[in-house]
Amino acid sequence: MNKQLAKQNEPATLQVIACGALARELMVLLDQLPDGAVSLTCLPAAWHNHPEKIVPGLKRKVVAARRKGMQIAVAYGDCGTGGTLDAFLEAEQIPRIAGPHCYEMFLGKVKFDAEMETALGTFFLTDYMVRHFERIVMKGMGIRQYPGLRDMYFGHYTRVLYIAQTDCKKLRAKARQAAIELGLDYEYRYTGYGDFHGFLSKLA
């Protein structure tokens, strides 16, 4: 997703630049803020598979926002950038939501650490990943075409943990099926929007 998603009633003074995989959740939260307070623009979620594109894409978004005189905040994890994302944001003095990835942002650091201590071999699914599991994992990682890749990629995992942003029976069923596809145990935690709610509320 590479288009601006914004409240239209009034010109926003703050723009959040985010991963497209978070767009649906962030828009729900933005709907709870005063109209026009914050606008949202996203980089493509598919760039998780091409992290070298993230920082250059972010730079372009920052330049565009500053030309409009907007303040900027970022809803991204490191996402495979090897620290270059944080180095850029620090140099530009742009705030980012705390956490290395969205799994910790949804669960919160304490709960995330506890889950990892319970089972280090955890493959996390969010609502977005459940919705797009076939495209991202089964086809995107080549498992549909080459089934032997499943154990190569997931042989060291022990469970799928679906951390849900919404209470949706259909998504729970899809997440359980995803675990079956991967040959892993299945567990479920409802997280809601985790740390993102507080992050956006403070910005507004």
What are these regions (language model features)?
Residues 36-54, 188-192:
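A short beta-strand-loop structural module common to alpha/beta enzyme folds
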Residues 17-24, 47-48, 75-85, 103-105, ...:
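Gly/Ser/Thr-rich loops at beta-strand to alpha-helix junctions
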Residues 2-33:
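N-terminal basic/disordered segments at the start of proteins
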Residues 83-136:
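Long, charge-dense
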Residues 31-40, 179-184:
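Short helix-loop-beta junction
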Residues 117-171:
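A conserved mid-domain beta-alpha-beta active-site/ligand-binding segment of alpha/beta enzyme cores
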